[in-house]
C-alpha cells in the first residue's frame, strides 16, 4: 500500500501529484466530452425529475442537439488546455449525465471516436455513470481499452443509506452500487467513487461510515468528495428557498473532511475534496472563495492539524466487514 506522501507534499494522496508521478512529470489534463446522454432517472426508465439536487436545465434535449461532435469537443478542449495550462497529455473524460446509458456497440463508437483524436498524447479514458447502468458487457468494453490507456469508471455512490437515496430521488439503491463495484472486482478498470456529504438528516457518524464502505473494495482507486450544495433549477433548491436547512460552513466541512480522510484507506487517491457549483447557479452555501482559495484553505487546515490520510484506518476492521 502507498503512503499519503507518495503523491505530493500534502497530507493525502493528491490527484494532480499522482498524475505527475505516473506520467514522468508531464502535465496531464482531463478533456470533457459531452456525448448528449440522458439519465434513466429522468426519461422514465427508472423515474422522472432526476435527483433532487440536480439542475434540471442541464438535461434538456435542446442542449444535446446543439453539441459539437466528440472529435470537435476534444480538439477544442486540447487546444484550450495546451494554451492555458501547457498540458502535454490528456485523459478523455465522458462526464455529463450517464455515459454508459446506451447499447455497448454505440458506446464503443463514441469512446473510439474520443480516443482516436490524438492517440500520441491521450493517456486515459474516464467514464462517468450510474451504478445501475453497468453490466459485464460494458465493463468488458472498458477493459478492452486498458492495453493502450489507463481507464477509470466514475460512479456516484452519493450515500450509503437507502433512506437518503430515496429522499433525493436517486432511483438507485445502495445494493445496486455494491453490485456494480463487485462486477469490476477482477477487471483492470479502476473505480472512482463520488460521494456527497451534508444531507441534513445524516449525522456526523453516519457520514464517517462512508469510509468503511469504500475501504472494503480494493478496486476503488479514486474518490471524489463533495459537500452538498444547493443550485438553482433543482427540486432541492426550490425546497431550500421555501424552508432553508443547515449546510456546512467551510470550517465545519474542513473539520469533517480532516476526520474522514484519516479513516480512508491510505492508498486511495483523492481526485476532489469538495464540490463547487457555478456561481450563477449556486444558492448555498456560499463560502465567498474561489476554487483555488478553498483548496488552499483546506490544505492549510489539514497541515496545521497534522491530519494524515489513513492514520485511523484499521485493516483488521475491513477484514471483519468483508466476511
Identify the residue ranges that each predicted region occupies.
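N-terminal [4Fe-4S]-dependent radical SAM core
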Residues: 1-52, 56-91
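Acidic (Asp/Glu)-rich catalytic clusters
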Residues: 81-85, 111-120, 140-150, 182-186, ...
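Short amphipathic alpha-helices and their capping/turn segments at secondary-structure boundaries
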Residues: 77-83, 134-148, 179, 208-219, ...
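Core AdoMet radical
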Residues: 57-77, 81-104, 117-134, 150-177, ...
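Short, electropositive alpha-helical surface patch
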Residues: 108-116, 143, 203-221, 250-251, ...
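Auxiliary Fe-S-binding modules of radical SAM enzymes
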Residues: 2-20, 24-29, 229-323
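Conserved C-terminal portion of the radical SAM core fold
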Residues: 175-235, 251-274
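Hydrophobic faces of well-ordered beta-strands that scaffold small-molecule active sites
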Residues: 29-33, 90-92, 125-127, 151-155, ...
Amino acid at each position: 500500500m502507498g503512503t499519503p506522501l507518495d503523491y505530493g507534499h500534502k497530507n493525502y494522496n493528491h490527484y494532480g501529484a499522482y498524475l505527475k508521478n505516473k506520467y514522468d512529470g508531464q502535465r496531464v489534463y482531463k478533456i470533457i466530452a459531452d456525448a448528449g446522454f440522458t439519465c434513466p432517472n429522468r426519461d422514465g426508465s427508472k423515474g422522472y425529475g432526476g435527483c433532487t439536487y440536480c439542475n434540471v436545465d442541464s438535461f434538456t434535449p435542446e442542449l444535446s442537439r446543439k453539441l459539437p461532435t466528440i472529435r470537435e469537443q476534444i480538439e477544442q478542449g486540447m487546444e484550450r488546455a495546451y494554451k492555458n495550462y501547457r498540458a502535454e497529455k490528456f485523459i478523455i473524460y465522458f462526464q455529463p449525465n450517464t455515459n454508459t446509458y446506451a447499447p455497448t456497440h454505440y458506446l464503443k463508437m463514441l469512446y473510439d471516436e474520443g480516443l482516436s483524436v490524438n492517440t500520441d498524447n491521450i493517456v486515459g479514458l474516464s467514464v462517468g455513470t450510474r451504478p445501475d447502468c453497468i453490466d459485464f458487457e460494458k465493463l468488458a468494453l472498458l477493459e478492452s481499452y486498458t492495453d493502450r490507456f489507463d481507464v477509470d469508471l466514475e460512479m456516484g455512490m452519493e450515500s450509503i443509506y437507502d433512506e437518503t437515496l430515496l429522499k433525493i430521488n436517486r432511483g438507485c439503491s445502495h445494493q445496486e452500487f455494491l453490485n456494480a463495484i463487485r462486477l469490476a472486482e477482477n477487471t483492470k478498470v479502476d473505480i472512482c467513487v463520488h460521494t456527497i456529504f451534508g444531507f441534513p438528516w445524516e449525522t456526523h457518524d453516519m457520514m464517517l461510515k462512508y469510509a468503511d464502505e469504500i475501504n472494503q473494495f480494493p478496486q476503488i482507486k479514486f474518490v471524489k468528495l463533495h459537500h452538498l450544495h444547493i443550485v438553482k433549477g433543482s427540486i432541492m433548491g426550490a425546497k431550500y428557498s421555501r424552508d432553508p436547512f443547515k449546510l456546512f460552513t467551510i470550517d465545519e466541512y474542513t473539520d469533517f473532511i480532516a476526520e474522514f480522510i484519516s479513516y480512508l484507506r491510505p492508498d486511495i487517491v483523492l481526485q476532489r475534496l469538495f464540490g463547487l457549483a457555478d456561481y450563477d447557479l449556486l444558492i448555498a452555501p456560499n463560502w465567498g472563495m474561489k476554487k483555488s482559495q478553498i483548496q488552499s484553505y483546506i490544505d492549510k487546515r489539514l497541515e496545521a492539524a497534522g491530519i494524515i490520510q489513513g492514520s485511523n484506518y484499521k485493516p483488521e476492521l475491513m477484514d471483519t466487514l468483508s466476511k
